[in-house]
């Protein structure tokens, strides 16, 4: 059984007060329309048609690389007119119609609407809400059958009391659309061609109207302004947090937790407040994430502790390692088992060996550090010569004293010691002590300058 999909995305969204179309506002780091497209793609439709209008190039660019046909609605004359523009690009089969600004709609709800709507039926997704203000109302006859959909601006006082609303999501065969769409008239307050008029045509043609409802009310909520966008963001994040907690993870405050990508979790993890997940992140078992941390495209293995105010990006933190507080692990780092990236330590493109420690105030860039090394406070691997990056290699059991600079390319041998305050420009052999600093002198004849006092 084939399926075509039409996504309406021509609106300007003036209440957003933005230079972007409304459907390109973001929720959980994805545009609104990307959320909708992702949901319908799981239905495996034969084709997806997106009707664009305001700033159409931006919408097309945002969806580049997907199997989508774009149709331009030059004049925004209403939803019925928008679907009419898409009609030539649809196959002779059922058509699912929905909006590009309903980001929380689930594949399951759409699938239920499609599956329960026969080829000769009209399927309508409706919902019961406590506050229907601004939404089209579902009008039923005394037998409970749907007779029409009335937009709020065209509704009378009795109709405005109705709590059942139109979600704007329909399923109908192309043959019926070909018959009904040209018959729509703009005889309403807005002087627009409303897609909702197909309900009236269905009744006149004795077409059965199949009504389904969403699993959760929030799934059908649209976005018209930034306040609504912020509210939906919290709904989305709360829903994600609850799914994660159901897998055996404790979250200190689900209202202060953001997933802006995909999070794969083990059991018995603890996530403190204001943690942000970006891209693809995987947590092992018994992981502790402190407050105000940002994790992006990384793997955190079992029993790792990421202390507060730390960032891990594009790296892997091995079992039992500790990061933070106030640490930054940049892309292409591999922090081995039991290693420590301490407070105010930054690492980039670095391997920190098993059991090695850089406990505080250190920069490790383009480095390969062996096992059980000690990197003292204030150590810098100077990897950049102004043109190219160079590598620092430190062998197992090496000890790098505080406030030392290692000028790459340089190798520190296994078991070697670098004295505090040294600037190392040559390789240090294994088990050697390297000291590079001026000899301390005491000058007993020296006198401190004295400031002259005013007479």
UniProtKB/Swiss-Prot annotation:
Cofactor binding summary note: Binds 1 Mg(2+) ion per subunit.
Active site: 360 (proton acceptor)
Classification via CDD domains: GT2_GlmU_N_bac, LbH_GlmU_C
Region of interest: N-acetyltransferase: 248-455
Enzyme class: transferase
GO molecular function: glucosamine-1-phosphate N-acetyltransferase activity; magnesium ion binding; UDP-N-acetylglucosamine diphosphorylase activity
Residue segments, region Pyrophosphorylase: 1-226
GO cellular component: cytoplasm; membrane
Binding site for acetyl-CoA: 377, 383-384, 402, 420, 437
Sorted UniProt keywords: Acyltransferase, Cell shape, Cell wall biogenesis/degradation, Cytoplasm, Magnesium, Metal-binding, Multifunctional enzyme, Nucleotidyltransferase, Peptidoglycan synthesis, Repeat, Transferase
Biological pathway: Nucleotide-sugar biosynthesis; UDP-N-acetyl-alpha-D-glucosamine biosynthesis; N-acetyl-alpha-D-glucosamine 1-phosphate from alpha-D-glucosamine 6-phosphate (route II): step 2/2; Nucleotide-sugar biosynthesis; UDP-N-acetyl-alpha-D-glucosamine biosynthesis; UDP-N-acetyl-alpha-D-glucosamine from N-acetyl-alpha-D-glucosamine 1-phosphate: step 1/1; Bacterial outer membrane biogenesis; LPS lipid A biosynthesis
Superkingdom of the organism of origin: Bacteria
PANTHER family: BIFUNCTIONAL PROTEIN GLMU, NUCLEOTIDYL TRANSFERASE
Function, as annotated: Catalyzes the last two sequential reactions in the de novo biosynthetic pathway for UDP-N-acetylglucosamine (UDP-GlcNAc). The C-terminal domain catalyzes the transfer of acetyl group from acetyl coenzyme A to glucosamine-1-phosphate (GlcN-1-P) to produce N-acetylglucosamine-1-phosphate (GlcNAc-1-P), which is converted into UDP-GlcNAc by the transfer of uridine 5-monophosphate (from uridine 5-triphosphate), a reaction catalyzed by the N-terminal domain.
Oligomer status and interactors: Homotrimer.
Protein name: Bifunctional protein GlmU
């Amino acid at each position: 059984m084939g399926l075509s999909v039409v996504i309406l995305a021509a609106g300007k969204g003036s209440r957003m007060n933005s230079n972007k179309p409304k459907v390109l506002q973001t929720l959980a780091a994805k545009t609104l329309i990307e959320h909708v497209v992702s949901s319908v793609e799981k239905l495996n439709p034969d084709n997806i048609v997106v009707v664009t209008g305001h700033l159409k190039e931006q919408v097309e660019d945002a969806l580049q690389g997907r199997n989508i046909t774009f149709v331009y609605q030059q004049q925004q004359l209403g939803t019925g007119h928008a679907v009419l523009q898409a009609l030539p690009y649809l196959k002779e089969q059922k058509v699912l119609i929905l909006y590009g600004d309903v980001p929380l709609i689930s594949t399951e709800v759409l699938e239920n609407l499609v599956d329960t709507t026969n080829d000769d039926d009209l399927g309508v997704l409706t919902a019961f809400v406590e506050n229907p203000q601004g939404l089209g109302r579902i009008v039923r006859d005394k037998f409970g059958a749907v007779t029409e959909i009335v937009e709020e601006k065209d509704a009378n006082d009795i109709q405005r009391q109705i709590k059942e609303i139109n979600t704007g999501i329909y399923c109908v065969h192309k043959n019926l659309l070909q018959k009904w769409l040209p018959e729509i008239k703009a005889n309403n307050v807005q002087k627009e061609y409303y897609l909702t008029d197909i309900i009236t045509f269905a009744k006149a043609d004795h077409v059965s109207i199949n009504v389904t409802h969403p699993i959760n009310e929030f799934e059908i909520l649209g976005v018209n302004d930034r306040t609504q966008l912020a509210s939906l963001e919290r709904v989305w994040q709360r829903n994600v947090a609850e799914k994660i907690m159901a897998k055996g993870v404790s979250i200190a405050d689900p209202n202060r937790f953001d997933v802006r990508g995909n999070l794969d979790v083990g059991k018995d993890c603890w996530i403190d407040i204001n943690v942000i997940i970006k891209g693809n992140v995987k947590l092992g078992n018994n992981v502790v994430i402190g407050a105000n941390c940002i994790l992006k495209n990384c793997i955190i293995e079992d029993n790792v502790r990421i202390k507060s105010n730390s960032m891990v990006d594009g790296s892997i933190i091995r079992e039992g390692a500790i990061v933070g507080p106030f640490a930054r692990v940049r892309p292409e780092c591999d922090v081995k088992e039991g290693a420590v990236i301490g407070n105010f330590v930054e690492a980039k493109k670095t391997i920190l060996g098993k059991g090695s420690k850089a406990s505080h105030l250190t920069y490790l860039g383009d480095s390969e550090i062996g096992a059980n090394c000690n990197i003292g406070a204030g150590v810098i691997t100077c990897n950049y010569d102004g043109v190219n990056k160079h590598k620092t290699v430190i062998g197992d059991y090496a000890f790098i004293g505080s406030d030392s600079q290692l000028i790459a390319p340089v190798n520190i041998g296994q078991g070697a010691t670098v004295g505090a305050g040294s600037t190392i420009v040559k390789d240090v052999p294994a088990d050697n002590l390297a000291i590079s600093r001026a000899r301390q002198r005491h000058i007993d004849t020296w006198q401190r300058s004295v400031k002259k006092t005013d007479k």
